[in-house]
């Protein structure tokens, strides 16, 4: 994908969350957003997803400007698959229904086609036996895999992951990261907010570190993680890799 952001700013009340964020990637397959909590990573991701509007600035995906008007955003959101840290599954629906509902209601799939699509993806993710269970009957890892399955069922142009393993224990975290890495290997483009530095190093083409609402450092993993140029980056990595 080609991704460009110019002077993105976003405030919530009196709090300035993004301060003139600029990105320019001619070709990036996997972008990891890292940095301290409250740095603006998730807000930037939500703007890319069309779930938040910037107060100022512009965003382009593959040379197409994202127009932040509701009519345009409805079309944009349909092309983006987003996976949140809290799963965001419908608690009253089964695993299967959590996938078929958006296919039918948002993407206008016929019910039979939606069901076949969902069953195929559940089989691929080794979740077929859980298709009629509610989210409450599933483990955290299973719920997150359902959320990922729902995101890719729409055949998105871009996948967005917002700290998808932050609520999981280490063993389940590894399971979910393996799924994400498989999707990367299959050629899906995605942007990933993560605190998993080892994983970011392995899967990302580019890494951007945000702190205080600004891009502090941006480049390939070998630069940002192995030979950081910014003192803020060095301090962040020293803290997160200490234990």
Which residue ranges define each predicted feature?
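C-terminal boundary and immediately downstream tail of ABC-type ATPase nucleotide-binding domains
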Residues: 218, 222-243
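ABC family nucleotide-binding domain
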Residues: 1-5, 9-212, 216-221
């Amino acid at each position: 994908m080609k991704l460009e952001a110019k002077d993105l700013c976003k405030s919530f009340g009196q709090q300035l969350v993004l301060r003139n964020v600029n990105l320019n990637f001619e070709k990036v397959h996997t972008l990891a957003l890292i940095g301290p909590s409250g740095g603006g990573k998730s807000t930037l991701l939500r703007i890319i997803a069309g779930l938040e509007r910037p107060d100022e600035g512009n965003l382009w995906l593959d040379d197409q400007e994202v127009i932040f008007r509701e009519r345009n955003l409805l079309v944009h959101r349909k092309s983006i698959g987003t996976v949140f840290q809290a799963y965001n599954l419908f608690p009253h629906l089964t695993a299967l229904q959590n996938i078929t509902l958006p296919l039918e209601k948002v993407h206008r799939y016929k019910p039979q086609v939606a069901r076949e699509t969902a069953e195929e993806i559940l089989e691929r993710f080794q979740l077929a036996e859980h298709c009629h269970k509610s989210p409450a009957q599933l483990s955290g890892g299973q719920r997150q895999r359902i959320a990922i399955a729902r995101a890719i069922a729409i055949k998105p142009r871009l996948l967005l992951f917002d700290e998808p393993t932050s609520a999981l224990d280490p063993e389940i975290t590894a399971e979910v990261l393996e799924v994400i890495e498989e999707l990367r290997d299959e050629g899906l483009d995605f942007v990933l907010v993560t605190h998993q530095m080892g994983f970011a190093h392995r899967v990302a083409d580019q890494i951007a570190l945000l702190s205080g609402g600004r891009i502090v450092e941006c480049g390939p993993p070998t630069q940002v993680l192995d030979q950081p140029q910014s003192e803020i980056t060095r301090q962040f990595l020293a803290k997160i890799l200490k234990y």
